[in-house]
């Protein structure tokens, strides 16, 4: 299902829009020009119907496609519905903002980087700073922080309502009992914890994502602590659909975990996030620990800067324990070394 260029809202200014419109709607058909403009505000709460923002339009398009699938019951279908919220900017119809009181939101207790963490490890939240109503440097005010958290909740509730419409259409079209549904996010989000906003880090709040699966024959209402990677979703879908997964797929099916939440698929997972100057942060997460190894690709292992966190004793990641637990570090680095080394997203061009 197309995204309908919903991120173009970032480049419109509120004062340029008629009161019955939204920044997002105003720019759906002007996306080429939108990229030439400075970013607008980080939030918006126009008193408009759901389909005046992108996710409402996406939901309507998904429903049309489900209705078309009903007309061909003998044909299987695959539908990828990519909702944008709660990505920045935090925009949603006013009724979703009205679900919450901004003053009721508590600010994070921990608003500083982990003790002993390298200076470059926390995100500088440049994505948020690009918006005209956000500071170019320094922290946001407590009022701004509450407003952003309010916006995140409103945007999440808005997306949830659109998802509900799609699921209702699946049911009303008689497709629900024979359809596999997977809901997941592509990253987490810092909401002021550790003094950070946005994603772009290797910390738990940014790296951990929700994954929800509903499928025929799978009992609902269960939770699991099993570790998975997003690469595991493809082979899981293939197994649930009784289809062979391509041999070259890196992921592992977790279909058996859906039947038995106490089962496991992986003993650890890997994720990566870079920093300037060519540094790559390769992270390994087990049920108890996360180790982050910061170094340039192909650099000697002894050049690495390390972070280690113990979620059993320190779930909030308040202190880097790498110097205090060398045995754990050595064990996790040995596991990490069994995986291919990550490369920069954009290779440095050789100077001529």
Tell me what each language-model feature is:
Residues 1-3, 75, 85-92, 99, ...:
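Short catalytic/ligand-binding loop motif for oxyanion handling, primarily in non-cytosolic enzymes
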Residues 4, 8-12, 18-19, 70, ...:
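C-terminal cap/loop subdomain of S1 sulfatases and analogous C-terminal strand-loop tails that border
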Residues 1-49, 199, 281:
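Catalytic-site neighborhoods of secreted/periplasmic enzymes
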Residues 89-94, 169-222, 229:
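Histidine-centered active-site microenvironments of extracellular/periplasmic hydrolases
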Residues 45-53, 141-154, 198, 218-228, ...:
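Active-site rim elements
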């Amino acid at each position: 299902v197309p995204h309908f260029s919903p991120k173009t809202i970032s480049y419109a200014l509120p004062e340029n829009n008629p009161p019955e419109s939204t920044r997002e709607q105003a720019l759906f058909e002007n996306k080429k020009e939108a990229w030439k403009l400075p970013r607008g505000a980080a939030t918006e709460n126009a008193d408009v119907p759901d389909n005046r923002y992108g996710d409402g339009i996406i939901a309507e398009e998904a429903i049309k496609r489900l209705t078309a699938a009903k007309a061909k019951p003998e044909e299987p279908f695959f539908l990828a519905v990519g909702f944008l919220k709660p990505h920045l900017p935090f925009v949603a119809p006013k009724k979703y903002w009205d679900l919450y009181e901004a003053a009721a939101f508590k600010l994070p207790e921990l608003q500083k980087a982990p003790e002993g963490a390298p200076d470059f490890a926390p995100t500088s939240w440049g994505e948020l700073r690009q918006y005209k109503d956000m500071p170019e440097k320094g922290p946001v005010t407590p009022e701004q922080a509450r407003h952003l958290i309010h916006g995140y909740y409103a945007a999440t509730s808005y997306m949830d309502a659109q998802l509900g419409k799609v699921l209702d259409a699946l049911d009303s079209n008689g497709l629900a009992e024979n359809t596999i549904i997977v809901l997941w996010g592509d990253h987490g989000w810092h909401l002021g914890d550790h003094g950070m906003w946005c994603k772009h880090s290797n910390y738990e709040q940014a790296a951990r994502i929700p994954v929800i699966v509903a499928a025929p024959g799978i009992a609902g209402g269960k939770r699991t602590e099993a570790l998975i990677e997003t690469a595991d979703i493809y082979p899981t879908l293939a197994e649930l659909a009784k289809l062979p997964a391509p041999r070259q797929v890196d992921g592992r099916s977790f279909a058996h975990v859906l039947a038995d939440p106490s089962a496991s698929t992986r003993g650890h997972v890997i994720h990566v996030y870079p920093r300037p100057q060519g540094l790559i942060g390769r992270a390994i997460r087990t049920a108890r620990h996360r180790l982050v190894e910061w170094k340039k690709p192909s650099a000697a292992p002894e050049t690495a800067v390390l972070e280690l966190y113990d979620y059993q004793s320190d779930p909030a990641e308040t202190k880097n324990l790498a110097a205090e637990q060398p045995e754990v570090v050595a064990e996790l680095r040995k596991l990490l070394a069994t995986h291919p080394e990550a490369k920069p997203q954009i290779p440095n061009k050789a100077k001529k």
